[in-house]
């Protein structure tokens, strides 16, 4: 039998889509047939809600070396724990007596990861505060487990003459197949490279600039048995690209205890304009939402206070 993603199977079982030929399917919602047999497409009222919690937690273990106050070396082992969950609900309604359907998703990811970071800062001129820095971050090796479940409900009814009416509710729940709702896999993130410059003017002004590059298209996915996730990795390679990040900032000492900070951060887009989320045939995912973020510009300002026993930043 031909493979089909969970989402397609759910839509077929709840009659949201129907077969129109060999391996061909069409939507059964969003239109009505008038008394002349013509299909009349209807305006849709969509409803979407989503709630997320958790995320990525990091724990760093550092060591640093100082050579003559001119060369500074640092190394970090990073450990990560992942605990993320999302609940979403989507519904399409149509005016009049047309059919409706809804999709409710539950998604959880958990796991651990580790990476390594190496960095160096050099003051090339003994009499100057000017400094140059460079750092390299290895990929983060994650071991993750996804758990997904969903319920799709519709009131679509297909008549014997091919017309569609609104009828009793049909429901398809993936929790009826609990053994199929988990995926264990490995994620290997891209390498990251960093260059920085810094300069201090007297005791009142500190200036800094930083450039970072990471090729997101080089990320890789593998199942926990080591087999490469071909479809997903191919989507990463063709849909993502290298990301350039530029950060500049300045700190001004207004008084011995008070400082004022300004900063700017520019990051290029990680995705091509036409990149979208495509669910693999063997994926347990049934959520279609995604964001294709463009280049971002962020501006920051801040105030700081540092006393003998207390400090605060805003």
Can you say where each PLM-predicted feature lies in the sequence?
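Outer-membrane beta-barrel porins/channels
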Residues: 1-314
């Amino acid at each position: 039998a031909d493979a089909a993603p969970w989402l397609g199977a759910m839509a077929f079982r709840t009659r949201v889509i129907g077969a129109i030929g060999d391996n061909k399917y069409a939507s059964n919602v969003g239109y009505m047939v008038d008394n002349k047999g013509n299909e009349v497409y209807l305006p849709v009222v969509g409803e979407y809600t989503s709630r997320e919690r958790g995320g990525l937690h990091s724990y760093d273990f550092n060591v640093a070396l100082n050579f003559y106050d001119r060369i500074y070396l640092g190394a970090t082992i990073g450990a990560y724990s992942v605990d993320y969950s999302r609940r979403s609900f989507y519904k399409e309604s149509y005016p009049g007596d047309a059919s409706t359907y809804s999709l409710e998703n539950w998604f959880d990811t958990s796991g651990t990861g580790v990476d390594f970071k190496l960095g160096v800062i050099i003051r090339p001129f003994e009499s100057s505060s000017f400094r140059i820095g460079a750092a390299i971050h290895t990929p983060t090796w994650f071991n993750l487990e996804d758990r997904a479940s969903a319920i799709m409900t519709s009131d679509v009814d297909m008549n014997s003459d091919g017309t569609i009416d609104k009828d009793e509710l049909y429901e398809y729940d993936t929790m009826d197949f609990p053994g199929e709702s988990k995926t264990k896999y490995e994620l290997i993130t891209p390498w990251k490279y960093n260059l920085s410059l810094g300069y201090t003017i007297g005791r009142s002004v500190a200036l800094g600039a930083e450039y970072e590059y990471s090729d997101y298209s080089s990320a890789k996915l593998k199942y926990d048995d080591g087999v490469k996730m071909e479809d997903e990795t191919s989507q990463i390679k063709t849909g993502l690209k290298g990301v350039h990040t530029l950060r500049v900032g300045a700190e001004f000492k207004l008084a011995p205890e008070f400082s004022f900070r300004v900063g700017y951060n520019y990051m290029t887009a990680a995705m091509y304009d036409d990149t979208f989320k495509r669910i693999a045939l063997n994926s347990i995912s049934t959520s279609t939402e995604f964001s294709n973020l463009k280049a971002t510009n962020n501006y920051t300002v801040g105030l700081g206070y540092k006393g003998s026993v207390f400090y605060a930043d805003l």
